[in-house]
Amino acid sequence: MAQLSNRLQRLAPSATLAMSQKSAEMKAQGIDVINMSVGEPDFNTPDPIKQAAKLAIDENYSRYSPVPGYPDLRQAIARKLERENHLHYTPAEILVSNGAKQSVCNTVMALVNDGEEVIIPAPYWVSYPQMVLLAGGKPVIVEAGFEQNFKMTPEQLEAAITPNTRMIILCSPSNPTGSVYSKEELQALAEVILKHDDLFVLADEIYEHITDIGKHESIAQFPGMKERAIIVNGVSKAYAMTGWRIGYIAAPEWIVKGCNKLQGQYTSGPCSVSQKAAEFAYVGDQQCVEDMRQAFERRRNLIVKLAKDIPGLEVNVPEGAFYLFPKCSSFFGKSDGKTTINNSTDFAMYLLEKGHVASVGGDAFGDPECFRMSYATSDENIVEAMRRIKEVLADLK
């Protein structure tokens, strides 16, 4: 019997997409589901950015774009990095891709050889280990749990490094936890990295603008780290442009050339119209970014307050992104008389089927004691969702 390739059979399906699909199926049946499983802003793309895209269509930006992205967009990204992050990159050190997910995948595929190790702190974004496996690498998971605010320590990093370690993947602000590494914490990690030759860090900074003011720092800022860091970012979260599919890497030119070679065979250049919209996003008025940041901060404060009022949940206050990652293990082994909760996946399914609130179990993110809720939704939805959760959890004995 014909089968799919071995490399594909090693991959797990996306748990976040599976839960979102289950939620959509229930909604199609007329069930009032509040979907807090989705990792995207609920805002519309700002009108000036949409107008820039319409202008690009009228100006006939309808042909293949250069594989690394339009020069004007790469220049706009370089200026953004200088202006906001105090990092100097040339356009030749920037590669634009079809979303930050492709940027991550390009980097892993370009740098990781068969059998080489990639250190990934857990909790992690669900796709990181799968991308490493796809590249033939070995994910090395470092547990950074609730008690340490979901952040890997330099001692843990040092202990995980072997002669076969090629890369570390670091996401700050974090999906799924909302944790943010401070400048001092990043510097301590950088000092460990710099002690080891040919060791790189993929710094996923896609949530950089969704933080408490002044919280975001880049690991590339420290002496010697620009040569070791691959920054991944994009327009999806900051500008509510998830569907436009524009991400990028900023990295040493030799790495960018390698990723460009790979991208040239996979997809070629990103969508021409999306690139012009992204260019305007970076050079235009940034007030929309601050407006959305303030909305997420208000929602964060609301959901934290309500979650802390639910007996049995333990809550760390997220400093960035738009996720709450509470500890739910106190409910394991409990039952409402029909359903028994054995793990975080059971817990999330119970909330969906009985409370009609979609979330994602922490098993998918490498932390079996917690679950993820996105608060990228209205205040009204947050209040109602937390009411439902509190009500159905009270039935577990």
Language model features: what each stretch is:
Residues 2-4, 12-14, 19-22, 26-33, ...:
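PLP-dependent class I/II
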Residues 8:
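Substrate/cofactor-recognition hotspot
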Residues 61:
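Flexible nucleotide-interacting loop at or near the entrance of a catalytic core
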Residues 64-97:
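Conserved N-terminal alpha-helix of the aminotransferase class I/II PLP-enzyme fold
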